[in-house]
Amino acid sequence: MGLAAPRKRTKISHDPNNTNWARSTSGFGHKILSSQGWTPGSFLGARDAAHADMFTAASAGHIRVVVKDDTLGLGARAGRDPNEPTGLDAFKGLLGRLNGKSDAELAADQRKADDIKLARYAAFKWQAVRFVSGGLLAQEKLERLPERESVQQSRAAVETSDSNRNSENDASKVSKKKKKKTSSDSSSDEQSSRSEKRREKKEKKDKKEKKEKKDKKDKKRKRAEEDNDASQKSASETPAPEKESTGLESDSTSVSVVKASRERRPLGRQIVRGRHIAQKKRALMDDKSLNEIFMVKA
């Protein structure tokens, strides 16, 4: 911000790396873990666990906790890491040249950094499925006791004897069932023949009812068409009334009367206005009245 920015005084604490809590042996956590058999530098959990071979040196390290200070959802990644230093690649290249690294080594390092940047950009631009390791599900070995094996053998012997008895009983039951089936088959055939006859009768009855309904509808439709035709013929046969007209005055008055009859007659308070407009139309269509209006002698 420069000299105009507010001055902030920061004081470096005695424990900048925050490691005193991990090294202290007087805390509650250290005491309770040591009481349960844990020693500094050893792993957490049972020593003879099924996944004990998978432990590495990183398993004994501290667990890093990152505080979530954004509004993104769980699992979402920001476009850029806020803690990432800018220009670190160029600074590393400069330090490499000062330390005497060759140009080939520097080019290889730069290529690796570029590949990492491209991979990050592709993962951010085109989201892909990420598989997170959830640990190992290892089952402990179960050793069978000899007593259980002897009990199982005795149970198996009892079951074989019971199965032999059941097989004899099943054979006798099967013979009885066969006899019953022969008698039941004959009765079922009779019932099926009766049901088929009933079904055929019902289908015939339904078809007959549908046909009667259809005939009734056709008759009604024909009657309606005949009535419409008769009404149209009667309307066409009635002669239209004609009036005899003499001279130009009678022709103009007849035309105006026909037009006025075809127009829609207003209702209510508009009757007076409609009459006035009709009178104007008649006066304009009559030559004599126009001459009187304009005071012209014919």
UniProtKB/Swiss-Prot annotation:
GO terms for cellular component: nucleolus. Residues 1-23, 145-274 are annotated as: Disordered. It is found in: Nucleus, Nucleolus. Residues 151-164, 247-256 have a biased composition (Polar residues). Its main location: nucleus. One of its GO terms (biological process) is rRNA processing. Residues 1-11, 199-222 have a biased composition (Basic residues). PROSITE patterns: G_PATCH. Residues 25-79 form the G-patch domain. One of its GO terms (molecular function) is nucleic acid binding. InterPro entries: G_patch_dom (IPR000467), PINX1 (IPR050656). Keywords: Nucleus, Ribosome biogenesis, rRNA processing. Involved in rRNA-processing at A0, A1 and A2 sites and negatively regulates telomerase. Belongs to the PINX1 family. This is Protein pxr1. It comes from Aspergillus terreus (strain NIH 2624 / FGSC A1156). The gene is pxr1.
